[in-house]
Amino acid sequence: MLKKGNKLITLKGNIINFDESFYGEIMFDEKINQINRVEKKSDDFIIPGFIDLHCHGANGFDTMDGWNSIKKMTEYHLKKGTTSILPTTWTSTFDHTFEALKEFENFKKINSNILGVHLEGPFINPNKLGAQPPLAINPSIDFINKLQELAPIKVITLAPELDNMESFIEEINNHGIKIQ
């Protein structure tokens, strides 16, 4: 989102939304305040921004590498049309994951394009790691509760075939976290 302090911003162009398109102007600050149809004067387009629900980074910057990396990757995403993201962790130690979530939440306080966190691992199958490091751990709701205190976890990627996963999944659902 464009932020210019408390100023009202006006953009004019071909507005494309879900069910129609027309030439108009959008006036907004933190949210859209008004949309008007106006006479066409340019070929610019105004479209909804993209939302990336599984984002490990961008332009060489990784979500797990601290505040500056998060800032640089969100700036890059915004320039390319992705207006909101769920920064996605990779399987790591509790301390490293804890620090990453703390940085996400600190950054979110000054930049509203982080919608929450996508936790990828560490509850993954050690025999099917893919690109994840071999740090898989057993399901632990205490682990999730400690991380939830730092930043809102919206999605967890996990291996449902692991032992004790059924009750863990039920508990995760009770927290309102989506499972992938």
Predicted regions and their residues:
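Active-site mouth loops of central-metabolism enzymes
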Residues: 56-68, 130-138, 180
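Histidine/acidic residue-rich metal-binding segments in metalloenzymes
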Residues: 6, 138-180
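Divalent metal-dependent hydrolysis catalytic cores, especially in the metallo-beta-lactamase
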Residues: 56, 71-100, 113-125, 151-161, ...
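Metal-dependent catalytic neighborhoods of phosphoester/phosphodiester hydrolases
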Residues: 62, 95-105, 130
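Short amphipathic alpha-helices and their capping/turn segments at secondary-structure boundaries
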Residues: 35-43, 98-111
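Generic structural signal for well-ordered alpha-helices
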Residues: 74, 98-105, 144, 169
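A conserved glycine-rich beta-strand in the N-terminal activation segment of trypsin-fold
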Residues: 20-28
